[in-house]
Amino acid sequence: MSKKPVRVAVTGAAGQIGYALLFRIASGEMLGKDQPVILQLLEVPVEGPQKALKGVMMELDDCAFPLLVEMTAHSDPMTAFKDADYALLVGSRPRGPGMERAELLAVNGAIFTAQGKALNAVASRDVRVLVVGNPANTNAYIAMKSAPDLPAKNFTAMLRLDHNRAASQIAAKTGKAVADIEKLTVWGNHSPTMYADYRFATIGGESVAQMINDQEWNANVFLPTVGKRGAAIIEARGSSSAASAANAAIDHMRDWALGTNGKWVTMGIPSGGEYGIPAETMFGFPVTCENGEYKIVEGLEIDAFSQERINITLAELEGEKAGVAHLL
C-alpha cells in the first residue's frame, strides 16, 4: 500500500542551499524511501530567481525521481504554503557589505513575519517548520510569533550544522569514526556564540571528555573552530557553506519525522523554561525524537564553564529578540 504524498514547501528554492537540498528531498533522503512528496517551491517575485527556479525544476524532472509526485513554482507564500506538511524556510536576506546586524534583523523580520502569517493562514495545522535562513533562531522566533494558531513547538531553527561540525572536529581529534559519537549537543544560538558541549559525549561507550582531556583545546581551539567554521568556508570557497547546510537540514527533518532511536541530536526549539532558558526563546537543546515529536534531554548537570557559555549565547539571543520586538 503506497503512502499518501506529503507536501513539502521550500523557500529560497533556487538559491545555493535550495539547489543542494531539493534533489535529496525528492530522492527520499529526508522523509524515507517509501514517502512520495509534492514540492511547493517559493522564490522572490523577481524575473531572475523565478527563471532560475524553472531551470531547477527542469533538472528535478530530468532525475525522474519515483517519489516526486508533483512540483509547483510560487512567488507568494500564501500559495506556496497551502496545506504544507513540512516547510523549510531557507530563503533569507544575507548580510551585505557595511550592513549592520540591526538592519539585517529588520529586513529578515519583515520576510519571516509575512511567512509566519502565511503559514498560519494556509498550512496544515500540523505543519513542521524548519528555519535555515539566518539569523535562524530569531527568524524562527518571528515566524512562530506570527503564527498564533499553529503549535509553537512546530517551529524550529537549524542548529544541526553546528552539531555536525562539532562531531566532525571531535572525530578528527580522537581519530574515531564520526558515526560512533553519541550524546553530543550544541546549546544556544546558531552563531559563533553557540556552545558545543561534549561533556556527556561517548564513543563506543567511552567518555569523549576523558579521551580528549584538554580544557585548553576545548575553550581555545574546538569552540572557536566550530563557531567560526562558516566564515572559514566563505574565506576558502568564496561563497557560503551551502551543501553542508542543506545536509544538516535533511538530517534535522529526517530525525524529527522518522525518529532518532534514542540518540541525541540538537534542534533549535522554543524553550519551555528548561535549563533556566526563558520560555519561548528559540534555543539549541539536546533532544531525542520519536513519532514525529522531539523531547528535550533533561536533568543534565551544567557546570560553571558551561553556564558561562550558555549565558553568553542567551544574552545574544535576548538582544536579537529585543531588536525585533517592534515587528511583532
Swiss-Prot record:
Q: Where does substrate bind?
A: R95, R101, N134, R165
Top-level EC class as recorded in UniProt: oxidoreductase
Could you give a single Gene Ontology term from the biological process aspect? malate metabolic process
Catalysed reaction(s) here are:
(S)-malate + NAD(+) = oxaloacetate + NADH + H(+)
Could you name the domain of life of the organism this protein comes from?
Bacteria
Entry keywords, A to Z: NAD, Oxidoreductase, Tricarboxylic acid cycle
Signal peptide as annotated in the record: none
- Keyword Oxidoreductase recorded: yes
Q: What is its EC number?
A: 1.1.1.37
Spell out the protein name for this chain.
Answer: Malate dehydrogenase
